[in-house]
Amino acid sequence: MASSLMSNAATTMAAATTTAQANMVAPFNGLKSVSAFPVTRKNNDITSVASNGGRVQCMQVWPPLGKKKFETLSYLPPLSEESLMKEVQYLLNNGWVPCLEFEPTHGFVYREHGNTPGYYDGRYWTMWKLPMFGCTDPSQVVAELEEAKKAYPEAFIRIIGFDNVRQVQCISFIAYKPASYDA
């Protein structure tokens, strides 16, 4: 008797559950038609990419031997005072913290202690004072640059910009090359 009551209750509960589930979830009708999506075919022919009149063979490579280049803007002539102020203003407009670094011997990446990148391969320079937190005027940064040039006239000096929110270096460029360096 007890087993028949139990089976009747289980059957009633299962029927109620199936009805509730059918009302809650829509039935699966299949995927949408493929014809509703636009399809474009890509052409893998490289000749269709060049739009300069077929002069692709005329491009030249910068000679890597005897012409050491460093970082951003190093392929340009030395920055004028006005250009330097504009670069520093760009750095400040983006909310980055300016900082000066100098390297008295090597202004470029080099390998001295092995063939893998490491601490002593020219990537890490000496910081000039502290980062200029709260700096709002490019002339403050240029004044620090002039002070660093007086203290280390034979050093390479670069200006970097840190994003203190993301904690990354966002910009870096050589602001001063020593007179003894022949580019």
UniProtKB/Swiss-Prot annotation:
Keywords from the named record: Calvin cycle, Carbon dioxide fixation, Chloroplast, Photorespiration, Photosynthesis, Plastid, Transit peptide
One GO location term (cellular component): chloroplast
Induction notes from the record: Expressed at intermediate levels.
Keyword Chloroplast: yes
Pfam families named among the record's database cross-references: RbcS, RuBisCO_small
InterPro entries documented for this protein: RuBisCO_ssu, RuBisCO_ssu_dom, RuBisCO_ssu_N, RuBisCO_ssu_sf
Transit peptide, residue positions per record: 1-57
CDD domains from the UniProt entry: RuBisCO_small
Family statement: Belongs to the RuBisCO small chain family.
Name this polypeptide is given: Ribulose bisphosphate carboxylase small subunit, chloroplastic 3
The encoding gene: RBCS3
